[in-house]
Design a protein with these regions (language model features):
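Intrinsically disordered, low-complexity repeat and linker tracts
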Residues: 3-39, 60-62, 432, 437, ...
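Alpha-helical transmembrane segments
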Residues: 38-49
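A composition-driven surface/loop motif
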Residues: 62-472, 488
Length: 498
């Protein structure tokens, strides 16, 4: 039996220095563990309290009450600046043009517009941050055409409310805590680039929804935690997102939608292992409209793409892939650099050997509890490659009697690998605990009967599913049109990081 860990919701963090919290040990399950969010109810209570208090605040929009630039504080109503590299209009708007100095903070709303090359560094706190004040809630909006570089002992970019990053420029941030952190929603709507690195916490984190749109490129990583975390939903559309982290690459608590986008996610061993490249609980994973997805997880009990749900009234445990190309790989690889196994996110002097076939890993995995919507993996007109030491693709339901089953649906597509591959029923029983646990569902394999052994050779360790040919257009004399199966180059973990 194996326990799994999760990044926890930051329910009582204050503006300023944000550091990773200790993981919470979770309940063990037979095939893949849960990342139960034990603080969710606390968050809901705090949210309700904040909502009530917000109703008592004026609905009129006010200017920022103050700003602090490189150690000096300026109050609203009077303009400020150094005459060349930065200027504040005394309200909500600040411009940067060639700024090279210390941290920038504001009470309330702050719109930062940048051009030219700008550097903001703070070795005692956050680089650019906004906090709530009496007259106005925090809101940070950053837009520009040049380059904005921010480094911080705390969070590089922080908002106690919402945050928006837009424009055509390049935003490059590194925080000793988080790279980018918003207490509420985060919107990245840019045709430029955003690079966010978190040393001790996440590369990007939001307490609400995260949306990535605009056709730009977002690259985020963490050296000790998740690459990107949305405590509500994450939506990536018509853009490119690359996320690399320890434990989890992409974590969307309440659901993930990838729409006509390119997403690459990498997860490496952390804490007690069980890394997952793309993960949701209480929310489904939807990949559609020509999206290209590469998910790679390395470590024992790893999963490339996984959705899980044990909460009554919630969704999750369902993965929908349509008209897209997906590669989900999970392996345990022994890395020997003379000390202990270490992933390449921090080290370059390692040796890669063949995956250890004895470790338990899954390419695409869905799991729900009895009484909830059954686990489902649906693949429609898509090219899917999945690899796992234990199972390439698996959908199961936990129950006390085995009466409910997870399902795999393949529509307008065929199983190309393994030879003779089909959708197989599985029924695993755990008799090692006082409460007998049944797990019923489906996998890709070669058996004609129900598979009862999780480690059966009849379970495909590699599965390739491809779209069927499109029917010829009429009239019949026109050439036959086939669906082109886009491909994603499989990138070895050694080459994923600069």
């Amino acid at each position: 039996m194996t326990t799994f860990t999760t990044p926890t919701r930051h329910t009582d963090r204050v503006a300023g220095l944000h550091y990773a919290e200790a993981p919470v040990r979770q309940r063990a399950v037979l095939t893949c563990g849960s990342w139960r969010r034990v603080t969710r109810r606390i968050v809901c209570g705090l949210t309700c309290a904040l909502t009530v208090s917000s109703l008592l605040m004026p609905s009129v929009s006010f200017a920022a009450e103050w700003v602090k630039v490189d150690g000096s504080t300026y109050t609203a109503g009077a303009t400020a600046g150094d005459g060349s590299t930065w200027a504040w209009d005394g309200a909500d708007n600040m411009t940067l043009n060639g700024y090279n100095g210390g941290g920038i903070a504001a009470g309330g709303k702050l719109n930062v517009s940048y051009e030219g090359n700008n550097t903001v560094a703070n070795d005692e706190g956050n680089s650019i941050s906004v906090e709530n004040v009496t007259s106005e809630g925090a809101e940070l909006n950053i837009s520009g055409t040049g380059t904005l570089t921010a480094t911080a002992e705390g969070d590089a970019l922080y908002s106690a409310g919402d945050m928006t990053i837009s424009g055509t420029g390049a935003v490059n941030v590194t925080g000793d805590a988080n790279g980018i952190y918003a207490d509420n929603d985060l919107s990245i709507n840019t045709s430029g680039t955003v690079t966010a690195n978190g040393t001790h916490a996440e590369g990007i984190r939001a307490g609400g929804d995260i949306t990535v749109t605009g056709g730009g490129t977002v690259d985020t990583r963490s050296e000790q935690d998740c690459g990107i975390v949305a405590e509500e939903t994450l939506t990536v559309s018509n853009s490119t997102l690359t996320a690399q982290g320890f434990g989890i690459g992409i974590y969307a608590f309440d659901g993930l939608t990838i729409d006509a986008a390119t997403v690459r996610a990498y997860a490496y061993p952390a804490r007690e292992d069980s890394p997952t490249a793309i993960y949701t609980d209480e929310g489904d994973i939807t990949i559609k409209n020509g999206s290209l997805v590469h998910a790679y997880a390395e470590g024992e009990n790893a999963a490339g793409i996984s959705s899980y749900n044990i909460y009554p009234g919630g969704s999750g445990g369902r993965i929908f892939i349509s008209d897209s190309t997906v590669e989900a790989i999970a392996h345990y690889i022994n890395r020997d650099n003379g000390n202990q196994p270490l992933p390449p996110i921090c080290y370059s002097d390692f040796v890669v050997v063949e995956p250890d076939a004895t470790a338990r890993t899954f390419g695409i995995f869905a799991l729900t509890e009895d009484g909830l919507t059954p686990a489902t993996i649906s693949i429609t007109r898509s090219h899917v490659t999945a690899e796992g030491n234990t199972a390439a693709i698996l959908a199961v339901v936990n129950s006390a009697d085995g009466s409910i089953s997870g399902t795999i649906d393949i529509v307008d597509s065929i199983i190309e690998t393994p030879d003779g591959g089909r959708i197989c029923d599985v029924h695993f029983v755990d008799n090692e605990t006082d409460d007998i646990l049944h797990q019923r569902g489906q996998t890709i394999g070669t058996a004609s009967d129900v598979i009862t052994d999780l480690y059966s050779d009849a379970i495909a360790k590699r599965a390739v599913i491809v779209p069927v040919d499109t029917p010829p257009a009429k009239p019949e004399s026109k050439p036959k049109v086939t669906t082109a199966a886009a491909t994603i180059k499989h990138v070895n973990a050694k080459d994923t990081l600069a």
